[in-house]
């Protein structure tokens, strides 16, 4: 019983105190919210100080880190030794910032001047490299470029300091990072300048865009993901926002469109942004001007924008204009980039990454497509004319620089240029056709104004007056008074039409005309205005008419046709919904198409390219090209239907050691096999579609097979070189150990020396065929005498390689004497000192046996201990140490007991195999 009473009391207490606890919780939340608000304000103030005074901001950050470090030290998380080390680092950084601030303040240059000078350093180094490569004297280059660098930094000493830091940053990124502390203030100044630019743009445009400075920065970042240049995106967003004529819903699309237009027109981003923001007060006028100036809107798109604008939804019309303009601009930019040569496209990417720092060098070092064609034609013409220059040029005509390869490159470039010219011509025709239709439509609309009825003119004025009154903040009574005045002015004018229809019939005809217009737009699957709003307004107007006591003739006519008008408005609203649905479906399909395009593999793109080329060739055949031209072009299409094999960068065992290079070879072999299988699939698919070119496909398949075999042979040769090099290194290290601990006359040292010598000979012999081939190719291209010189060069190269082998063979153990001598000769290197003798083999054997007997009777404590350790990451390391009067040698190998690559290579080279124990 007592328990039940206690439970009831507990429930009552909880129920009665619930409201009190909720009140306390609310108060605690308000206090916490207020505390967080003060904290945010305090943090914002600290960030503001950091932006205004970058050095103060840096010092504040370091002080905060030091405070946090002390807090962790007091709590016992960080030990004393670690605390002292980290605290010392923070103190050094604090001193560096303060010292850099003092030096910058007292120096001859400002931070801005210093930063500007540093930006010019890469260009100066590029000029130096180009001048030296073109053959100028080093002294001349030093006087020219050195003087410019001196002037940039205000003297020889400041220039030497700046360039020393710049070169150190190139050579050693760690020291470059340490030097960056001295220019910490410059980075903060740049960030503050960028943030201030966004804020100024917002206020300069009276915040018509409706976004904050950070929001505008985010829009620029999103646009840069599409355009690839954050600098251009920032400029475009700032220019559009500062104009005060672009809404937030348009900023994203117009920023992306501005960057694209600037790229393919060559205009400045600021100029394009200003022109887009000042196109006109209405979406219709802006669309017409954009179509006229840039040709980026089709006739159908213009009609849709005009229709939306005419129905009073001006902002929606502007949004649609921005979306269509951006979509068409991105497509035009894509066509423009595809028309460029590979070098031009690569240069644009590089120039975007370094903010156009090397624009002046482009025309000299990176030629455009026409300059590439002219250069290749000049090389081929020089080789055909012969002479000394022709012979020299032909001497270097191997690989991708061969005459055949250059001719293929020339044909490909000419074809790309002609195709781009044809595409540009077709695009110009399409653009002109769209512009003509837009101009004709505008002229038609102007002429149509002459024939509008008084009723239509009155309705337009009423609609404009109603919208103007709402924007001005007037009440409905004032707006209705103005509308009544407009109606009265038209009633006083006699109608020029005889037998005019009543108001109800005229409204019904107007709605039917709108329905017919929407049906036409439906065929183009474009979205129109909001007819549902018109239906709601009509229902309100109809209810108002029914509630009135007295009606005018027009109002009575509207009531008489109320059912028909309502039915027509419902049909218009239903059609509008269908148009909106189709628009969304079309947008989804477009997104799906772009998704599939982004997911296509290189093989699929290559197949489509080959198919398109054959389609063009078939059309050309129908146009009347000869069979020989058709066959030659078809063979070239077949030869270019596959891609080149992946290249292997070569052997470099400096970083990862021989094992790392073997892993790279395995990866290269896997890539090569995948490429070969993919190219065979592409070839077979093309063969099925073009069976009449079976002979050409067979020839292309043989080329693929040969290219695959050559690449596999190169990889295998590299694998043999790495294996032999690793074995040579291993036995070389072993011989060094034997020499150190057992002497040069020991059996272990002699065996290791012979093994190292064998691997060196084998590695040299592997390079003999390649050396001969390279020597022959270098000379065979010279006219008339080339083949003969090539044979001679190959023979000389082989002789040199074999001489190297002979030299390796002639290397013997220093000071070795086989028959015994009585005295040390005056010349030569011998392992004897004066007073010592070299005995005969028989005497030496007796001495060795005696020494062995002596050692067998001694303890083994003095003999060295060799530990073999398997660790692939430290393979090749040898460590020696002395412990308890005994030498201990640790030899680290990659594979101790397993059947690894090294074991296989040794077994293959010497015919050895493992046996069970």
UniProtKB/Swiss-Prot annotation:
Predominant location of this chain?
virion
GO BP terms, alphabetized: symbiont genome ejection through host cell envelope, long flexible tail mechanism; viral tail assembly
Question: What residue spans carry the region label Disordered?
Answer: 852-877
Which InterPro entries does the record match to this protein? GpH_LAMBDA, Phage_tape_measure_N
Q: Look up keyword Ribosomal protein and say if it applies.
A: no
GO annotation, cellular component aspect: virus tail
- Residues annotated as coiled-coil are 501-528, 575-602
Q: Which UniProt keywords apply?
A: Coiled coil, Viral genome ejection through host cell envelope, Viral long flexible tail ejection system, Viral penetration into host cytoplasm, Viral release from host cell, Viral tail assembly, Viral tail protein, Virion, Virus entry into host cell
Compartment(s): Virion
**A Pfam family of this chain:** TMP_4
Q: According to its UniProt entry, what is the function of this protein?
A: Serves as a ruler that controls the length of tail by stopping the tail tube polymerization and is probably released from the tail shaft during infection to facilitate DNA translocation into the host cell. Assembles into a multimeric linear form probably arranged as a coil of alpha-helices and stabilized by the covering tail assembly proteins. Its C-terminus fixes the tail tip complex, thereby forming the tail assembly initiator complex. Tail tube proteins polymerize around the tape measure protein, displacing the tail assembly proteins.
Q: Which family does it belong to?
A: Belongs to the Lambdavirus tape measure protein family.
**Subunit structure, as described in the record:** Interacts with the tail initiator complex presumably through its C-terminus domain. Interacts with the tail assembly proteins.
Q: What is this protein called?
A: Tape measure protein
Q: Which organism is it from?
A: Pseudomonas phage PAJU2
